[in-house]
């Protein structure tokens, strides 16, 4: 029987929120170097992609972990209960401390596929997916969701549906799907959410998410709401990659972290190239699917991170503009060196 990582975390624990195209295996190593949270989450992995021959390779790449990740939770999404069971059963051997079902992502494509926040509208299906996942694994199963789909008041009916299933943890983003991140998080509802948890599933760890920027704010919230067990930081990491510490980084420390990110990206790229090349040699069908081309990591998504490191000093915008014209990590390093960083 696997340990319940949620029961081992300290009161007031911190989590890096799962963010599509952000919290991959490379960036998590950067955050770990700056100052890691108590718990990491992966990016979202679609259960039906894992269940298909065509999509499994990509799903497994999303689930890759580094030694510095532990403990880490695999976050998964979808709407097919059997596929939830299939992926949940495979996760035990991949180094995860648990799995989390996303029932809160507001992305319209995810919602159109019946996943993420769309599950708020299909509570019976949501419960069945949760049950199937839990039955297939000894890992603790948790859920991340929102207050509701359209109206804030939905939480009074929606959260008890989940809590009655006794998930290991429940993370509540304090907004609705309709609100996205356009309005302030509804911190005023925390006491009522706590009462719901205490009355329905007192053993479930409660995590709050939304408008939480750094460790200092986590501690302030912990003092105000001592019954909440943990806090999840998402976009705050873009403002300060040291957000899980009390350290205020200097400009040069941020550039040092930037160069580390580039090095880790290159290492992951080389690893992916080697793995793909080996598989193509061993599997002619896979080589045919790849058109005989060995592909590493795409460079363009790396540019999403530049604003984390290059901000808050005179000339930052101009330097970022130059960096955005780069096409390789070597070009990025050359621009940084020329700029004196």
Which ranges hold each PLM region?
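N-terminal small/glycine-rich loop or linker at the start of catalytic domains
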Residues: 9-13, 48-71, 105, 110-113, ...
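Alpha/beta enzyme core
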Residues: 33, 85-99, 103-113, 124-206
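Hydrophobic faces of well-ordered beta-strands that scaffold small-molecule active sites
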Residues: 14-17, 40-42, 72-76, 99, ...
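Conserved phosphate-coordination/catalytic loops
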Residues: 78, 120, 124, 184, ...
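Active-site beta-loop-alpha junctions enriched in small/polar residues
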Residues: 19-21, 45-47, 77-79, 104-106, ...
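Glycine-rich, positively charged N-terminal anion/phosphate-binding segment
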Residues: 2-4, 19-93
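Short glycine-enriched, charge-decorated loop/helix-capping segments at active-site entrances
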Residues: 114-120, 179-180, 247-248
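Alpha/beta catalytic cores of nucleotide-metabolism and tRNA/nucleoside-modifying enzymes
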Residues: 1-10, 14-15, 20, 26, ...
């Amino acid at each position: 029987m696997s340990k319940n990582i949620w029961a081992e975390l300290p009161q007031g624990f911190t989590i890096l929120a799962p963010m599509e195209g952000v919290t991959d295996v490379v960036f998590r190593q950067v955050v770990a170097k700056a100052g890691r949270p108590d718990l990491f989450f992966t990016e979202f992995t679609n259960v039906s992609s894992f269940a298909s021959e065509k999509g499994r390779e990509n799903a497994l790449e999303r689930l890759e972990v580094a030694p510095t990740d532990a403990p880490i939770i695999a976050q998964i999404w979808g709407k097919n209960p059997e596929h939830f069971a299939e992926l949940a059963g495979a996760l035990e051997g991949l180094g995860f401390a648990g799995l989390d079902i996303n029932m809160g992502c507001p992305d319209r494509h995810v919602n159109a596929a019946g996943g993420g926040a769309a599950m708020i509208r299909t509570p019976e299906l949501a419960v069945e997916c949760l049950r199937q996942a839990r039955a297939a694994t000894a890992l603790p199963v948790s859920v991340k969701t929102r207050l509701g789909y359209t109206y804030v008041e939905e939480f009074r009916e929606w959260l008890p549906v989940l809590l009655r299933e006794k998930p290991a943890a429940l993370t509540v983003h304090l907004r609705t799907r309709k609100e996205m991140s356009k309005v302030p998080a509804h911190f005023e509802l925390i006491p009522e959410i706590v009462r719901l948890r205490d009355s329905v599933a007192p053993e479930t760890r409660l995590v709050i998410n939304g408008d939480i920027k750094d460790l200092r704010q986590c501690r302030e919230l912990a003092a105000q709401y001592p019954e909440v067990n943990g806090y999840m930081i998402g976009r705050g990491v873009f403002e300060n990659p040291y957000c899980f510490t009390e350290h205020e980084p200097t400009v040069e420390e941020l550039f040092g972290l930037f160069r580390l990110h580039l090095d880790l990206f290159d290492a992951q790229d080389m690893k992916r190239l080697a793995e793909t090349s080996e598989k193509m040699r061993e599997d002619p069908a896979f080589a045919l699917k790849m058109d005989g081309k060995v592909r590493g990591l795409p460079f363009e998504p790396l540019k999403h991170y530049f604003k984390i490191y290059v901000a808050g000093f005179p000339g930052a915008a101009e330097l970022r503009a130059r960096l955005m014209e780069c096409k390789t990590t070597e070009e990025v390093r050359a621009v940084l060196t020329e700029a004196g960083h």
